[in-house]
Amino acid sequence: MALLSAVKGKLISVIGDEDTCVGFLLGGIGEINKNRHPNFMVVDKNTAVSEIEDCFKRFIKRDDIDIILINQNYAEMIRHVIDAHTSPTPAVLEIPSKDHPYDASKDSILRRAKGMFNPDDMVANRG
């Protein structure tokens, strides 16, 4: 498991299928806090939607997590909970899975972020 840095860095958490979680765990994001709660959840075909929802709610309450990565197909299952999360941290990023490609039109957080910026302002600021 990854160690927290000397300056008490924040964690990335993952809610995803086995392949997604294993990939991120091999990358070193795995952590178990002092209460023995991991920062990841492996979702499979037998996982209830309520379990995904409960895990997401636990992750947004943890003060040691700054980013939540979630497979977009699981985010769709708990869309109402994700949309209710309006705090900037932890940031929620929807990612593709092996079997479900990313679809920007389904990403409510991306839509919200796009609404904050006017494309004309971006072009004007270049010059």
Swiss-Prot record:
Q: How does it assemble?
A: V-ATPase is a heteromultimeric enzyme made up of two complexes: the ATP-hydrolytic V1 complex and the proton translocation V0 complex. The V1 complex consists of three catalytic AB heterodimers that form a heterohexamer, three peripheral stalks each consisting of EG heterodimers, one central rotor including subunits D and F, and the regulatory subunits C and H. The proton translocation complex V0 consists of the proton transport subunit a, a ring of proteolipid subunits c9c'', rotary subunit d, subunits e and f, and the accessory subunits VhaAC45 and ATP6AP2.
Specify the species: Aedes aegypti
Q: Sum up the protein's function in the record's words.
A: Subunit of the V1 complex of vacuolar(H+)-ATPase (V-ATPase), a multisubunit enzyme composed of a peripheral complex (V1) that hydrolyzes ATP and a membrane integral complex (V0) that translocates protons. V-ATPase is responsible for acidifying and maintaining the pH of intracellular compartments and in some cell types, is targeted to the plasma membrane, where it is responsible for acidifying the extracellular environment.
One Gene Ontology cellular component: proton-transporting V-type ATPase, V1 domain
Task: Specify whether RNA-binding is a keyword of the entry.
Answer: no
Q: Which family does it belong to?
A: Belongs to the V-ATPase F subunit family.
Task: Supply the NCBIfam families for this chain.
Answer: V_ATP_synt_F
InterPro entries under this entry? ATPase_V1-cplx_f_g_su (IPR008218), ATPase_V1-cplx_fsu_euk (IPR005772), ATPase_V1_fsu_sf (IPR036906)
The name under which this protein is listed is V-type proton ATPase subunit F
Recite the UniProt keywords alphabetically.
Hydrogen ion transport, Ion transport, Transport
The molecular function GO annotations come to:
proton-transporting ATPase activity, rotational mechanism
The family database entries (Pfam families) matched by this protein are listed as:
ATP-synt_F (PF01990)
The question of whether Methyltransferase is a record keyword is answered with no
Q: Quote the SUPFAM superfamilies the UniProt record gives.
A: AtpF-like
